[in-house]
Design a protein with these regions (language model features):
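Acidic/aromatic-lined carbohydrate-recognition and catalytic surfaces
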Residues: 1-179
């Protein structure tokens, strides 16, 4: 269930805690009013229904997920007089996952800003986790960092529903963690 890395291998994940955005149900985002059928249909998802084209999937899925994130931000913008107010369960999720979520989101924002290259190829101040450079980057990239947190929130919300359903039917789900 972890994000896949190079070659889409689950054993080359960048996180032992994060969920794979590939598993976010786009129809659920549509049902929540964050996507439209037209937005989903407009994307190219691959030519062969019997084979997964991960390159195409990556490009299309993240484009659609960014659209959903923009709609989510818009949906909650200005509520309670706040520029960025989100549902209570989002804050509960962020607090419960504080031990890894902020670093993961910062890492993914840095990875995106650096053309998805390995962290070993990033500018020195990021490779060595210079606190001032990271704080400056985080302040400048608040929306991008928020995107990666949103994906984890959506993944966790949907995963809990699947797991609860399976458990209610007497199905136990087992897995392993990449190390």
């Amino acid at each position: 269930l972890s994000p896949t890395g190079y070659g889409d291998s689950p054993y080359q994940s960048c996180s032992a805690f994060a969920g794979n955005p590939y598993f976010i149900d786009l129809d659920a985002l549509k049902a929540d009013g964050l996507l439209t059928a037209a937005q989903l249909k407009a994307e190219k998802w691959g030519d062969d229904p019997l084979s997964v084209d991960y390159g195409t999937l990556y490009t299309s899925r993240y484009k659609v997920l960014r659209t959903a994130y923009a709609a989510w931000r818009e949906k909650y913008a200005g509520l309670h007089g706040c520029a960025h107010y989100y549902p209570d369960d989002y804050y509960a999720f962020a607090l419960a996952n504080d031990s890894w979520l902020n670093d993961y989101a910062l890492y993914m924002a840095l990875k995106t800003a650096n053309g998805m290259k390995s962290w070993t190829e990033w500018p020195r101040e990021y490779r060595l986790r210079d606190a001032a450079a990271l704080a400056k980057f985080a302040a400048e990239q608040e929306e991008e960092i928020g995107f990666w947190k949103f994906l984890q929130y959506e993944f966790a919300t949907q995963w809990k529903k699947v797991k609860d359903y399976a458990n209610a039917k007497g199905v136990k789900i087992l897995g392993d963690i990449p190390i």
